[in-house]
Amino acid sequence: MEEERVEGSKRPFQGIIRDVKGRALCYKQDWIAGLRSGFGILAPTTYVFFASALPVIAFGEQLSHDTERSLSTVETLASTALCGVIHSLLGGQPLLILGVAEPTVLMYKYLYDFAKGRPELGKQLYLAWVAWVCVWTALLLFLMAIFNMAYIINRFTRIAGELFGMLIAVLFLQQTIKGMVSEFRIPKGEDSKLEKYQFEWLYTNGLLGLIFTVGLVYTALKSRKARSWPYGTGCCRSFVADYGVPLMVVVWTALSFSTPSKLPSGVPRRLVSPLPWDSVSLTHWTVIKDMGKVSPGYIFAAFIPALMIAGLYFFDHSVVSQLAQQKEFNLKNPSAYHYDILLLGFMVLICGMLGLPPSNGVLPQSPMHTKSLAVFKRQLMRRKMVMTAKESIRQKATSSQVYEDMEQVFIEMDKSPLAETHTTLINELQDLKEAVMKKSDDDGDTGEESGFDPEKHVDAYLPVRVNEQRVSNLLQSLLVIGAVFALPVIKLIPTSLLWGYFAYMAIDSLPDNQFFERTVLLFVPPTRRFKVLEGAHASFVEKVPHKSIAAFTLFQILYFGLCYGVTWIPVAGIMFPVLFFLLVAIRQYLLPKLFKPAYLRELDAAEYEEIPGTPRNPLELSFRSNNSARGVQECDAEILDELTTSRGELKVRTLGHNEDKGHQIYPKEIVEVGDGDMSSSRE
């Protein structure tokens, strides 16, 4: 099973026209589906809001440090809210979540370092010059969309995506270390004679910061795994897993006020940001007036960083969009890669002229959004289908009639302007039909006499559906607007908690990153490798010789070191995206000469293939599990958690290398284990 491939065309505007026509057919339905969801849509909305707002607040504090408060949390929140509203109303793929991301912060730091060192620009014209960079960036994005360049994303394989993810993770950890060290130092521009900056209080602030940073990281990581806790009800575990991280920020912020009263004001150090209505914040909205003050030489020089930023946004935005609409989610509405790049260009232009850092598609919030809507849609469909089945059984309907009633409900709830044919829908329900009829043949003719259990069998055989709509994206963007005006409360958060949140994001992104997994595998001695095979592991562990794994991983480590090293070069570090585009050519022309094609396919697979370490009933993306027959109940979100990586990427479960591998187990298959025999049926 391959990732959806972006279609290309030699005719200008062809991709945009195709995208607009495709999305226009379902635009009205996008709103109807969201409004019909009622208050239930608030669950995925708040879930995505907290997942989106916290990183943006952290990036705002980082920007404030890197640009000497030329930009702050006000601007990052405003950009996220503005771009989120625009995309939810006009975007092609409404499941895509936009926000200010680490690459943008990194680029803006390089641009600030360049402008500060030039008397013609300086801090005064920094944002005006950056606005010209955004103008060039927007023009380049327009050209990419017009000439259908989105198909190039097909050439970016796992090796590029995981190297980029690892680089961001390391930059997060780097920012954590820098932030923790800064807690022991006097901030730039502050009066060193103030009481809070005396040695003993600086040391106290640093130690408190260390406690808060480590405390948040530990509790956030623990709460993230709450669904697998053995105690508590399913609802409680799901709540802690979904909202545990922002909850821990609130808890640790509250604890920061429990310090002794003798501590001077400013210990522990808290978020520093102007309020939206302060004069400092209002000046950013008039940056367009200063653009004429930038000399022509610097206007044309802005094209160089714009080229890097446009390429970075194109890569990041398209990859995130792919992960938000993976085939395994069974989305009904078409993609809009070319049109979304065009719209991104307009948003970059608007943000630049308003003095805001632009927003683009973000990970893992976008696939998290899709996953939360899949859980919500499943709950709605399951509830109605179970009720219908029970009513039919109560009326002593035959098993075939029970199935037909449930089938009708499924078709009715799955209606969309671009819905699949009736035959395709029926094929997806084939396993449910077989379960109903099998029980009828074994136990009786009517639904009541048969062994068919609506609660168990509907839960096991219900296909994945996503509630594709625009309301949740719009609502979470409006909540971000609310966060802008809630800055007086947000400023109560200790800065050390934001450094801890950076560390949490870095650590949480490492599991399921195959580059990281292979790096760890290098340190496992041959006598202990059986331990790796005992747990769930990537398929390459069994299918590729260890020497080839080691060689491929060492190449990645060296290339990663090169990418990370470039980011340390003053000003010129802005060129680091070039290395990721160069990697496309290396992957296509050099690596096939160094590794066998079969090995390279495993090491750089399009999908995350996983082999179970111990025999157990596999969980399917169709939410079917025989565990329920053994009395084990798993909530919908827990099933999807096991099926997705930390990036939101869906896993493909395969048989072990030494097992019977007549075929690969795809998400739409179920393996039924009987009395010692194993058989599989395809939907």
UniProtKB/Swiss-Prot annotation:
<feature type="transmembrane region" description="Helical">
    <location>
        <begin position="566"/>
        <end position="586"/>
    </location>
</feature>
<keyword id="KW-0039">Anion exchange</keyword>
<feature type="topological domain" description="Extracellular">
    <location>
        <begin position="499"/>
        <end position="565"/>
    </location>
</feature>
<feature type="topological domain" description="Cytoplasmic">
    <location>
        <begin position="1"/>
        <end position="38"/>
    </location>
</feature>
<dbReference type="GO" id="GO:0006820">
    <property type="term" value="P:monoatomic anion transport"/>
</dbReference>
<keyword id="KW-0406">Ion transport</keyword>
<feature type="topological domain" description="Cytoplasmic">
    <location>
        <begin position="357"/>
        <end position="477"/>
    </location>
</feature>
<feature type="topological domain" description="Extracellular">
    <location>
        <begin position="316"/>
        <end position="335"/>
    </location>
</feature>
<dbReference type="InterPro" id="IPR003020">
    <property type="entry name" value="HCO3_transpt_euk"/>
</dbReference>
<feature type="transmembrane region" description="Helical">
    <location>
        <begin position="39"/>
        <end position="59"/>
    </location>
</feature>
<feature type="transmembrane region" description="Helical">
    <location>
        <begin position="159"/>
        <end position="179"/>
    </location>
</feature>
<protein>
    <recommendedName>
        <fullName>Putative boron transporter 5</fullName>
    </recommendedName>
</protein>
<feature type="topological domain" description="Cytoplasmic">
    <location>
        <begin position="180"/>
        <end position="200"/>
    </location>
</feature>
<feature type="topological domain" description="Extracellular">
    <location>
        <begin position="148"/>
        <end position="158"/>
    </location>
</feature>
<dbReference type="GO" id="GO:0016020">
    <property type="term" value="C:membrane"/>
</dbReference>
<comment type="similarity">
    <text>Belongs to the anion exchanger (TC 2.A.31.3) family.</text>
</comment>
<feature type="transmembrane region" description="Helical">
    <location>
        <begin position="478"/>
        <end position="498"/>
    </location>
</feature>
<keyword id="KW-0472">Membrane</keyword>
<dbReference type="Pfam" id="PF00955">
    <property type="entry name" value="HCO3_cotransp"/>
</dbReference>
<dbReference type="InterPro" id="IPR011531">
    <property type="entry name" value="HCO3_transpt-like_TM_dom"/>
</dbReference>
<keyword id="KW-0812">Transmembrane</keyword>
<keyword id="KW-1133">Transmembrane helix</keyword>
<feature type="transmembrane region" description="Helical">
    <location>
        <begin position="295"/>
        <end position="315"/>
    </location>
</feature>
<dbReference type="GO" id="GO:0005452">
    <property type="term" value="F:solute:inorganic anion antiporter activity"/>
</dbReference>
<feature type="transmembrane region" description="Helical">
    <location>
        <begin position="127"/>
        <end position="147"/>
    </location>
</feature>
<feature type="topological domain" description="Extracellular">
    <location>
        <begin position="60"/>
        <end position="80"/>
    </location>
</feature>
<comment type="function">
    <text>Putative boron transporter. Boron is essential for maintaining the integrity of plants cell walls.</text>
</comment>
<feature type="topological domain" description="Cytoplasmic">
    <location>
        <begin position="587"/>
        <end position="683"/>
    </location>
</feature>
<feature type="topological domain" description="Extracellular">
    <location>
        <begin position="222"/>
        <end position="238"/>
    </location>
</feature>
<feature type="topological domain" description="Cytoplasmic">
    <location>
        <begin position="102"/>
        <end position="126"/>
    </location>
</feature>
<feature type="topological domain" description="Cytoplasmic">
    <location>
        <begin position="260"/>
        <end position="294"/>
    </location>
</feature>
<feature type="transmembrane region" description="Helical">
    <location>
        <begin position="201"/>
        <end position="221"/>
    </location>
</feature>
<feature type="transmembrane region" description="Helical">
    <location>
        <begin position="239"/>
        <end position="259"/>
    </location>
</feature>
<feature type="transmembrane region" description="Helical">
    <location>
        <begin position="81"/>
        <end position="101"/>
    </location>
</feature>
<feature type="transmembrane region" description="Helical">
    <location>
        <begin position="336"/>
        <end position="356"/>
    </location>
</feature>
<keyword id="KW-0813">Transport</keyword>
